């Protein structure tokens, strides 16, 4: 093994592994950046993240990696943090655990208030991202599609930083006022992130962007004598510094002079809009807008904040009407790299968010709930994102035509795995007898002590199949969307250990399940047209059998559809490339050896009514989040009200 750390580089990849298989060639081609945008077509299990890490080191470019969901973003964040321990690897996702946006449904005359649950830990990580981007050059940001939503102006964030240097004089009263203006709060008793205190000649600040250290600045009279980072628990000195920049405690900071200008501009826009409604003889809308906006203005004057403050972002940032909002991409100066992971899913999400936001807000504006300037607080359009792009790599096992077109057909393939495993053999069988044939296939897997994934189209089918397999003495479990992360991990571990020999699921078996013991994937109703059985989905499902040297896929279908044939042909093409490579280089495929994750089993106890209600609240909360995500706001409100009723019954609010 070879360590690849380069001590004189800005980005230092630290690993004991060297690129193998197709990785060296892919890294070389991607690092050349022959076109501004490129596609990395990487088969399942070929180590795409490791390839990207090597490109980051070769290019020495600050990087943003965008994933299509929080879970995948978290996985990428952990991987890159391990690969770049000396660099600032940051995590930038939405800080809402639950978010139901404000909305108005004109057809039913229903107004829906904004409702949200904020995750303070994620909020702190977002501030950490902005702080690193403002103070360092060696930054890798891993984010979700929330990265295209607005954030604080880069110039404002830098402008508000407090800079301390050993030997310089400072006015202590001014320091206190500045910290308060940065949204820090005085707390002489206990320091937590976003708090500070003076104890004699010592200033201690717990930064809003980290929980790893407290900044201690010792003064001699008005001169800085010492700057240290100390452990918040032990008070042990971690680092002694010559200088330090303390950034804002929150993502958004507005000084008083800017706030005064913003309030003046909001009043002016309000008057113009009220006049417009009155001229249209829409008096009710004019009155409603005046009431809501004046209430918000009073809060802004008193506290510098109001409910729905995001609707006034353009005024608070002193931006021009219809201007592009600030985003994390504006924090990059010069050349930088954007990596869009699982681009076949992420890119459509990025494309659709602008129009979804516009549609919702336009109703609020048209009916007098919000000022027209609310439209200027929005996600970037894809065209705006493209204007900010410098270098782009789209990463996917199944890239779409859109990515290939954007890259001018510059597609770099990574098909050979570091384990030299080849794509599985595909067999098509008639589905008339698919259940009995499946049982025979599962039993045959026992000879090699391997496992089986079965993917079906509906929940009912999954439940019925699971029950029938149990009756036939097959050790089977059903994995579905409502299973929690810990329970999911337990199921996978039990499958790997042999407690189960088969797992039945729907689309959850498509991506993200890395189980080397699975040698057989069975696809029911492969010939039914639709998204779950299109070419890309089928290739993703097929990839679940690519972790085992005995990998096979059985498609149950009465005829071979065009989408099936494309998936079969592409898999055969990849398999041929992989086998030719192995023959040329005398490589033998070997099943991945992956240690089992230890998870303490959960012992279930008899539940009281309160415990049952608490469990139901958690389940309802999931449904509420799903309804809000699908913009089914009426259903979300009904579920929320049901939750409130249950909370009253058990006498306290359950944290969900």
Curated annotation (Swiss-Prot):
Pfam families: Helicase_C, ResIII, UVR, UvrB, UvrB_inter
Domain Helicase C-terminal: 434-596
GO terms, biological process: nucleotide-excision repair, DNA damage recognition; SOS response
Keyword DNA repair: yes
Compartments reported by the entry: Cytoplasm
Residues that bind ATP: 42-49
Domain Helicase ATP-binding: 29-414
Keywords: ATP-binding, Cytoplasm, DNA damage, DNA excision, DNA repair, Excision nuclease, Nucleotide-binding, SOS response
Classification via Gene3D superfamilies: P-loop containing nucleotide triphosphate hydrolases (3.40.50.300), UVR domain (4.10.860.10)
Positions of transmembrane segments: none
Major localization listed first in the record, in broad terms: cytoplasm
UniProt-listed InterPro entries: Helicase/UvrB_N, Helicase_ATP-bd, Helicase_C-like, P-loop_NTPase, UVR_dom, UVR_dom_sf, UvrB, UvrB_inter
GO CC terms: cytoplasm; excinuclease repair complex
Domain UVR intervals: 614-649
S-S bridge residues: none
Signal peptide start-end: none
Keyword Cytoplasm in record: yes
Position of sequence motif Beta-hairpin: 95-118
Family that this chain belongs to: Belongs to the UvrB family.
Role this protein plays: The UvrABC repair system catalyzes the recognition and processing of DNA lesions. A damage recognition complex composed of 2 UvrA and 2 UvrB subunits scans DNA for abnormalities. Upon binding of the UvrA(2)B(2) complex to a putative damaged site, the DNA wraps around one UvrB monomer. DNA wrap is dependent on ATP binding by UvrB and probably causes local melting of the DNA helix, facilitating insertion of UvrB beta-hairpin between the DNA strands. Then UvrB probes one DNA strand for the presence of a lesion.
Protein's name in the database: UvrABC system protein B
